């Protein structure tokens, strides 16, 4: 009897549960596993893997800790435990939605306005992007996404929704900026294959490039989606992490400008209804564990649908009340944004200087984010300028230099040899160790080339 039970087939699961569309086999996630199995610690494991594949902001966490020490009432349930424990509005507490709208305005220098009634809260940007994909597209439809793009989009946009991603190929010759020709080519190819394209998703500032989109590029994308009856999702989760010129131009700013310039004309309102902004506190505030994301739409029907669907991705009332108190303190919010930008600028400069000493070039014009897009194409060698060659190099970096960096192919970059290197999720001392290791690895590689 026992033997028969042990030899019986496994119970079947759903197609979604067994699908490979999650993307967990990507080198992006494989690098995380290498770190998890052998994590670096300066005392207990100094030869371990240093995690440079995680875009996490730890450079300003002391400012948040200081605020909490000075304002313990912000996180103390106290007499408010009943209010926190009972049911609240699914799409977010009014006080927190108001605080989030104000903070989103602050980090954009007041150049865009956000209505708290259009703020829908989600458990992070992952949930926000998936929720919008569910709302805007049906299974089998597609979104255009410029490359290179955040590897998690393969999971966030495709896995549970059944929606496809059509990459918009951008190249280094244009600084990986989105061009009208690239958008048109991707769209035409998808339509020719019988795919209905429902929208364009961009990240601004870009992950993994660490650059902001030019105003003209954004204007062109707005006109493109209007011309082809599509939507635009602008993922702006790094909007408060712009540390150098040029300043961020948010798509929300352009919507406001067009409305003012055209006095509520039908074409300006038509474009506004196609625009949806995603934001999160995971990057700018460094609070990924709090799971706070935002869907902001100028489309009433999208806001209504997002509110209905947000019941699957709620933010706890305690989290909302704590952050509402913090972000409602306008003086603190403004001071934090300034200090965080200064610190990211210094950290970015240190990372770039160390990479250059190691013989690694970085993408020019980078001015935002928690990472550097680095050019290691010269390390691929003759005949190795392929995805396979890039992955062989990546495996060596992980195994020999004990550094987890993200290969460009995991970001769907069509030019092998580019990598994303994160710099804000570790101490300065650990960053220096990582850069030294990379320099030693490259010297070893150069020695091998000389000997061959």
Curated annotation (Swiss-Prot):
Give the UniProt keywords, A-Z.
Ethylene biosynthesis, Lyase, Pyridoxal phosphate, S-adenosyl-L-methionine
Record carries keyword Heme: no
**Pfam families according to UniProt:** Aminotran_1_2
List the SUPFAM superfamilies. Answer: PLP-dependent transferases (SSF53383)
The UniProt entry, under CDD domains, shows: AAT_like
What residue ranges carry the coiled-coil annotation? none
Q: In which tissues is it expressed?
A: Expressed in leaves. Expressed in roots and leaf blades. Expressed at low levels in leaf sheaths and shoot bases.
Which species is listed as the source?
A: Oryza sativa subsp. japonica (Rice)
What is the protein name given in its UniProt record? 1-aminocyclopropane-1-carboxylate synthase 3
Report the EC number(s), separated by commas if there are several: 4.4.1.14
């Amino acid at each position: 009897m026992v033997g028969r039970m042990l030899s019986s087939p496994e119970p079947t699961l759903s197609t979604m549960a067994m699908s490979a569309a999650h993307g967990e086999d990507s080198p992006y996630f494989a690098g995380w596993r290498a770190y998890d199995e052998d994590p670096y610690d300066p005392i207990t494991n100094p030869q371990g893997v240093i995690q440079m594949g995680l875009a996490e902001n730890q450079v300003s966490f002391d400012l948040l800790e200081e605020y909490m020490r000075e304002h313990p009432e912000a996180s103390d349930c106290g007499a408010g435990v009943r209010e926190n424990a009972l049911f609240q509005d699914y799409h977010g507490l009014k006080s927190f939605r108001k605080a989030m709208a104000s903070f989103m305005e602050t980090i954009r220098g007041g150049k865009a306005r956000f209505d708290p009634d259009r703020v829908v809260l989600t458990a992070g940007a992952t949930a926000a992007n998936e929720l919008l994909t569910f709302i805007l597209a049906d299974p089998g439809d597609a979104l255009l996404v410029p490359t290179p793009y955040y590897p998690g989009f393969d999971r966030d946009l495709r896995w549970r929704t059944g929606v496809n991603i059509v990459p918009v190929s951008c190249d280094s010759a244009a600084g990986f900026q989105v061009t009208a020709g690239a958008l048109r080519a991707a769209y035409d190819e998808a339509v020719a294959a019988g795919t209905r394209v429902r929208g364009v998703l961009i990240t601004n500032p870009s992950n993994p490039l660490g650059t902001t989109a030019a105003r003209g590029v954004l204007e062109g994308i707005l006109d493109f989606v209007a011309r082809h009856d599509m939507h635009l999702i602008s993922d702006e989760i790094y909007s408060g992490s712009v540390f150098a010129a040029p300043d961020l131009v948010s798509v929300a700013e352009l919507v406001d400008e067009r409305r003012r310039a055209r006095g509520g004309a039908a074409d300006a309102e038509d474009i506004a209804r196609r625009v949806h902004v995603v934001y999160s506190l995971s990057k700018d505030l460094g609070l990924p564990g709090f799971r706070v994301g935002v869907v902001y739409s100028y489309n009433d029907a999208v806001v209504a649908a997002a509110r209905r669907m947000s019941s699957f991705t709620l933010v706890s009332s305690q989290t909302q009340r704590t952050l509402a108190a913090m972000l409602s303190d306008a003086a603190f919010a403004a001071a934090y944004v300034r200090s965080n930008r200064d610190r990211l600028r210094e950290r970015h400069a240190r990372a770039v200087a160390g990479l250059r000493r190691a013989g690694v070039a970085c993408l020019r014009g980078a001015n935002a984010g928690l990472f550097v897009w680095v050019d290691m194409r010269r390390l691929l060698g003759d005949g190795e300028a392929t995805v396979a060659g890039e992955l062989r190099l990546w495996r060596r970096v992980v195994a020999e230099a004990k550094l987890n960096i993200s290969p460009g192919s995991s970001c769907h970059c069509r030019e092998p040899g580019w990598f994303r290197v994160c710099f804000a999720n570790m101490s300065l001392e650990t960053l220096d160790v990582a850069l030294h290791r990379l320099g030693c690895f490259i010297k070893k590689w150069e020695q091998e080339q000389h000997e061959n």
